[in-house]
Amino acid sequence: TLHDADIYYWNAVAQHELVFVAQAFRTSIQQLVEVVRHRVEVEYIDRNDLLIAEVKLNDADFQLLQTRDNAEIARLALNSFAGVNPSDTLPIDHSVIALKQFIPLSDEIDNAITSRPEYRIAQNKIELQESSRKIADARFLPQFHIGVDGSYSSPGYNFKSDLDPNYAIYAKLSIPLFEWGKRKSTRNASSYAINMAQQNLSKAQDKIRLEIQTAHYNYKQAIDKVKLTESSLSKASESEQMAMERYKEGNVSIVEVINAQLYHQQAQVNYIQSKLNAQMAKTDFERAIYYLREKE
């Protein structure tokens, strides 16, 4: 389905984007190592800061390997879903598209409900029960039949040698007699079946409406989180730059610089995750209102 295709596609894009984040983080740590090494060489600080920075560089290398593995697994999963060779490389976006606006929940929600297969199945069951009641009622209604019957006889009344046809037209009226309440019990059973089918339709309608409203709420919340994490990302980037400048000036420790780098990296990860969640919430909402199924 298109819903599953969206999941595989955007997950592959997100994992690919996380590789760039890991690469950027490693580059940032590498720059810190160079700064610390220079300060050690001029004997401005001891080697402890350099050891701390080099350990973080190893951690950054490890994270980069992990993100590349995750990206490759996501790529293979996308290829498998698309039915292409594992060695093929499908073209994808370099980053998850950030959704900033959501599809409004219009007044046409009732149309969205009636387009769902669950609703149509429940409605068809009502029509089926109503047809069954009509068939059952027909057994107890008077039935009028008209027919023609004929025969040949020889000789005729005028003593001719040819066969003489004789026709008879008849009419028959069948009236069902009292059957010990069978008609009433049959109609009651039919009415009960129709009422149950109508209740099931109402339940299906309520369930679909709740699903649509919940999907729309999650979609809206996901958009808000994209905006929030985007704001945090901008602040975290600025904080890292300030921490590095203050470290060069000797005003903060290396731990504060590394923490600022980690906060920036986490802000990037959160931003990508929020963008991915928004795309998933969007496709969930579209499926709930049947947009995707209509395209299939």
Task: Give the residues covered by each predicted segment.
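Bacterial Sec-pathway N-terminal export signals of envelope proteins
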Residues: 86-88, 92-127, 177, 205, ...
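Amphipathic alpha-helical coiled-coil segments
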Residues: 3-20, 38, 74, 121-136, ...
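Small/polar (Gly/Ser/Thr/Ala-rich) solvent-exposed segments
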Residues: 1, 16, 120, 127-130, ...
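Residues on the lipid-exposed face of transmembrane beta-strands in outer-membrane beta-barrel proteins
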Residues: 78, 171-175, 274, 285
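Membrane-embedded beta-strand positions in outer-membrane beta-barrel channels/transporters
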Residues: 9, 145, 170-172, 216
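Periplasmic alpha-helical coiled-coil/stalk elements that build and connect Gram-negative outer-membrane
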Residues: 1-111, 218, 222, 264, ...
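Metallo-beta-lactamase
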Residues: 67, 117, 197, 274
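Hydrophobic, lipid-facing positions within transmembrane beta-strands of outer-membrane proteins
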Residues: 108, 167-173
